[in-house]
A protein has these predicted regions:
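N-terminal localization/anchoring segments of enzymes in phospholipid and broader phosphate metabolism
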Residues: 1-341, 345, 349, 389, ...
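Glycine-enriched alpha-helix->loop->beta-strand junction motifs that scaffold or abut catalytic
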Residues: 223, 377-379, 410
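Helical hairpin unit composed of two closely spaced alpha helices linked by a short loop
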Residues: 350, 360-382, 386-387, 391
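Thr-Gly-centered strand-to-loop micro-motif
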Residues: 356-358, 415, 434-435
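Histidine/acidic-residue-rich catalytic or RNA/ligand-binding cores of hydrolases
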Residues: 365-368, 395-397, 426-427, 445
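Catalytic-core elements of nucleic-acid end-processing and repair enzymes
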Residues: 423
């Protein structure tokens, strides 16, 4: 093989004397060029480490990046500019300015809630802090339907789209060009041709299949399709932080769907290379829907600079249910680390039970400490993780937490019946959340997420029964299992833990 390559190069240089002269010039100056490359790489590493010290949020992260940037800059400098920037200040400032255009609508929604007597005062501890973080209010008069797995979820979403009379809002991180994506497209095209306004927002990095040519049928039917970018141009595809990880569908401002499922065949368990897919979504009706709509409006305005005319008249659910719920959109442009503080508050509020399910479990030290303190208070703390995963690095990192959690009595389980992707918490038989946020740094600080929080004993009971079945379909994991593994596996686990801030 190498001989063939040598012959090809020889023939090429024979035909192109200028290239041959250039190659000879490079060979003669190889040592000097390598020296200059070495100097340039380390200078770039030193300058980038100054930026890392100024911008990385934690001391541990700043130290890790500084060491890497100054010792192996050839790898770490490009890695930092792709993964490491947790404060893209220009974007954050622009995003906050953009929110000013939608703030009056947001405020009017909150005023309408109060005027209609739809604001709730849940007995859940620290609810005021949650409302201030969310910039939303807990509302009464909602109903919720728990949707377990993809078939139930997309059946519900497609039925809801069929019933739309005014508009449909669709926002997903991933939309595939497969059977499921095609079915969604068909239904949206059909509604648009009936005169219903249809808006679709997708993340450009999460949905690389959706090139402009594949969107022609949607646009020809009158569907307004936009992509979510953090920067303009080709550079956006290299910006892996600040992605829009939300999964939202809203119909007529009266019904919304939120949860862990993207649009694709694998999310319905139809990809033989992945197998069964375990996930959770929720359908809500009532005044909380317009809180979800606020999040969509803000994202849409960022992507299009358009303010949509939507229904902002909050009404109780037609079912007559009075569930208390709150919509919590979070993202890197928030003035506080909203997602981090929300889940820390939830952990600290637990007095009896704290069960959480997350496909990506890479908590930082403050979350590990909060979970340990909850267990020491006598709270039944359980963590449900996938056994089969689509991210080996995250799975390796997850092993590193077993000893810290087990020593205080926290029980860790790995789900056995397929790939588990749900993002669910259950607290004290009253409070539960379903949404898009994983238990990792990327969801807590770097991505746009949305979580639906419920303070309702009956609905929390449904979530409890669902999780009890999931725990029954899982196996307990002990720290001894890691100790019994070989040295190189344990070494890989520790190395993966070092990369937790960028996972």
């Amino acid at each position: 093989m190498f001989e063939k390559v040598r012959q090809l190069l020889s023939r090429y240089f024979d035909r192109h004397p200028a290239a041959k002269r250039t190659a000879g010039w490079l060979r003669k100056r190889k040592r000097r060029l390598l020296t200059w490359f070495f100097i340039f790489a380390h200078l770039a590493g030193a300058l980038t480490s100054v930026r890392a010290i100024m911008e990385v949020r934690t001391a541990q992260g700043a130290i890790a990046w500084t060491v890497a940037l100054n010792t192996v800059p050839y790898v770490s400098v490009p890695a930092y500019w792709i993964f490491g920037r947790s404060k893209f200040q220009g974007y954050v400032i622009a995003r906050r300015k953009d929110l000013a255009h939608t703030s009056s609508i947001h405020l009017q929604y909150l005023v309408n809630l109060t005027n209609r007597g739809l604001v709730a005062n849940p007995t859940l501890g620290h609810s005021l802090a949650v409302e201030r973080l969310a910039r939303m209010r807990f509302t009464r008069g909602n109903d919720a339907e728990l949707l377990v797995d993809g078939d139930a979820t997309f059946k519900s979403i497609f039925e809801g789209i069929e019933q739309a009379k005014e508009y449909v809002l669709v926002e997903f991180y991933i939309i595939r060009k497969d059977n499921t994506g095609g079915e969604l497209k068909r239904r949206l095209v059909e509604k648009a041709r009936q005169g219903v306004r249809v808006y679709v927002l997708y993340d450009e990095v999460g949905s690389p299949d959706l090139i402009e040519s594949s969107l022609t049928e949607l646009r020809d039917a009158g569907v307004d399709v936009r992509r979510f970018n953090t920067t303009q141009g080709r550079a956006n595809r290299w910006q892996l932080n600040f992605r829009n990880h939300r999964k939202i569908v809203v119909v007529d401002g009266q019904t919304a769907w939120i949860g862990g499922l993207n649009v694709g065949d694998e999310y319905l368990g139809r990809d033989p290379t992945i197998g069964a897919w375990r996930d959770t979504h929720v359908k809500v009706t009532g005044p909380v829907v317009q809180g979800v709509q606020v999040a969509f409006l803000e994202d849409w305005h960022w992507a299009s600079q358009q303010l949509l005319k939507l229904n902002w008249d909050p009404q109780p659910s037609p079912s007559g249910a009075r569930r208390v719920a709150l919509s919590l959109p979070t993202g890197p442009a928030d003035s506080l680390e909203t997602c981090t503080l929300f889940f820390l508050n939830a952990i600290n509020a637990a007095t009896n039970r704290l069960w959480l399910a997350s496909p990506y479990f890479v908590p930082d030290e403050q979350f590990v400490s909060a979970l340990q303190l909850a267990a020491l208070r006598g709270v039944d703390v359980r963590v449900l993780l996938p056994d089969k995963t689509d991210n080996k690095l995250v799975q390796l990192s997850g092993w590193s937490y077993l000893d810290e959690l087990e020593k205080v009595g926290i029980k860790v389980y790995r789900y056995q019946k397929g790939l588990m992707h749900q993002k669910v918490t259950f607290i004290d038989d009253l409070y539960c959340t379903i949404g898009t946020a994983n238990f990792d740094n990327r969801s807590f600080r770097l991505n746009f997420e949305i979580t639906m929080a419920f303070a309702d004993a009956e609905f929390a009971g449904q979530v409890r029964r669902m999780l009890e079945q999931d725990f029954a379909d899982a196996k307990p994991v002990k720290a001894q299992e890691l100790k019994d593994r070989g040295f190189w596996f344990r070494f890989s686990v520790r190395c993966a833990r070092l990369m937790a801030p960028i996972q």
